[in-house]
Design a protein with these regions (language model features):
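Nucleotidyltransferase catalytic core that binds NTPs
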Residues: 1-173
Length: 173
């Protein structure tokens, strides 16, 4: 059995408390925005990492998703948005970031996220996962559900920012 070492703190070499919030964000929702905003007091910088999943065919290309996320956080110097297509553990190691931020909507999310946190920690022992429960009003939101509702001309104005709703309507209606 491999020897496990004590994880590093969440401080990067620059002394900043940094975290990565990774996802496809196709599209970003108020649930995502809420997790990021509630996590900001704990970190000096959060890197929102637009990732590619081989399992999912995104509605929007990565540069569009990146812009949609950036538009949610204009003026917020503690949020940086990047695109990455490799392993999250490798990105974290390369950028000297030791914390992954994840939002949890329910027990089914926890099961999946626990598996991912364990695998990421096995690939990069300096990496820890910071879980935040979704706020009650966003507990049921997911990007797939939003795309389904809007494709039938439903109202998603309380689920996504206005610029995201506009982009969704342009693409799906």
């Amino acid at each position: 059995m491999a020897k496990r070492t004590k994880a590093k703190s969440n401080h990067s070499e620059s002394g900043k408390r940094m975290a990565i919030y990774s996802g496809t964000f196709d599209p970003i929702t108020f649930g995502h925005v809420d997790v990021i905003k509630r996590a900001l007091p704990f970190f000096d910088e959060i890197v929102v990492l637009i990732s590619h999943s081989g399992k999912k065919k995104p509605l929007f290309e990565a540069p569009v998703r990146k812009q949609l996320v950036e538009d949610c956080f204009k003026g917020e110097s503690k949020v940086r948005v990047e695109v990455h297509s490799g392993l999250l553990a490798d990105y974290a190691r390369k950028n000297n970031i030791h914390v992954i931020l994840r939002g949890l909507r329910g027990i089914s999310d926890f099961d999946y996220e626990f598996q991912m946190a364990t695998m990421n920690n096995r690939m990069n022992q300096d990496l820890q996962t910071f879980f935040l429960m979704a706020s009650e009003q966003y507990f049921f939101i997911n990007s797939t559900l939003i795309k389904e509702v809007i494709s039938h001309a439903g109202d998603v104005s309380e689920l996504v920012p206005p610029h995201v709703e506009k982009k969704l309507r342009e693409r799906l209606c």
